[in-house]
Swiss-Prot record:
Biological process, per Gene Ontology: thiamine diphosphate biosynthetic process
Alphabetical keyword list: Cytoplasm, Schiff base, Thiamine biosynthesis, Transferase
Organism taxonomic ancestry: Bacteria, Pseudomonadati, Pseudomonadota, Gammaproteobacteria, Alteromonadales
Name this protein carries in UniProt: Thiazole synthase
Pathway: Cofactor biosynthesis; thiamine diphosphate biosynthesis
Cross-referenced Pfam families: ThiG
Record: residues binding 1-deoxy-D-xylulose 5-phosphate: 156, 182-183, 204-205
Subcellular location(s) of the protein: Cytoplasm
Organism (species): Shewanella halifaxensis (strain HAW-EB4)
EC number(s) recorded for this UniProt protein: 2.8.1.10
Amino acid sequence: MLTIAQHQFESRLFTGTGKFAASEIMLTAIQASQSQLVTLAIKRLDLKTGSDNILKPLLDRGVKLLPNTAGARNVKEAIFAAHLSREMLGTNWIKLEIHPDPKYLMPDPIETLEAARILCEQGYVVLPYVHADPVLCRRLEEVGCAAVMPLGSPIGSNQGLATETFLKIIIEQANVPVIVDAGIGAPSQATHAMELGADAVLVNTAIASSSDPVAMGRCFAQAVNTGRQAYVAGLGAVSHQAHNTSPLTGFLNDE
């Protein structure tokens, strides 16, 4: 069971709502993935009604919503988006995203840390999306973030765990849940992230862009469970040398 800010999740697969061809496909794929936390961009919401056509169906399925500040370019815009989401959705949970570069969507570490500090002081449950920077993740933990969400590779790239070396350090040092976010493009990559000791993964593009998002959602659910079970069971040590698993020639010397 994964606990974030006193909220428990049985599933360690978190999902997104973007890039699906249709809302019905998205809802069915999320259900197939067994995800219990779904992130959605605040900019998708209707400012007049505080919802969009997927909000109620998600809530009806018992999914916890994690609004995100995607599109925010600085501290001011991110805080405004967080305030807006709390007013519209009645939640103090926020996925903090600040990426001023529209081409590569790299998160701004300086603006993110400052926004996280302010939002934590205001009582938000902050889950920041950041580079796989162990020092930054430690600082975010110190200002009160409920979890950290380091990227595996650029958003939507499906490149997998390009930052594996740094993810290992973050996982080793963290005292809050580590959720690998962005770049996971295949179920095998999600399994590997969980084998490293990640507490959860967030997957969107790999499911939404699949030719069969519903089937892919099921695949990711199985992959995450397998990776977690392998981590708990304990993986064997990696060696650069061969080690025999049974005696090779000892019996030849017996008389």
